[in-house]
């Protein structure tokens, strides 16, 4: 989800500069940005065909890659590439973002209708796991990441060590 082009940060791969941990919300924001951009580009005159094709291919590749990480509950883990690891958890906001991106792409015709089932499964998983009715009848939604980030001085490496901080 991050890169240090200097390759000096303690959390980055010293060859690529990339963070070794993939955060769901970062991936979700990127996925959402791709489909939202495709929706906004005015390409009626086909002036941007090459650019739109590049965005569409990136979107489809990302979605297909992320579906491999979708938990049987329908949700995705906060640190995607460490699903099921102790202290990692199924995260609500990123799973919601992925469901949004999938449904929007189906509606716009960038993905086949078959992809809607993955979004529905995510929404159902969120509701079953984290949507609760309080005593006063109001709803409460949990499992939302409270804090995540990379830091300096050997702290906040992006691992699951602090993913237990949720709403």
Enumerate the language-model features and the residues they cover.
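Acidic/His metal-coordination segments adjacent to aromatic residues that form catalytic metal sites
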Residues: 8-19, 77-87, 158-162
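Loop-centered beta-sheet repeat module
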Residues: 1-35
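Well-ordered alpha-helical scaffold segments within catalytic/enzyme domains
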Residues: 29-51, 96-111
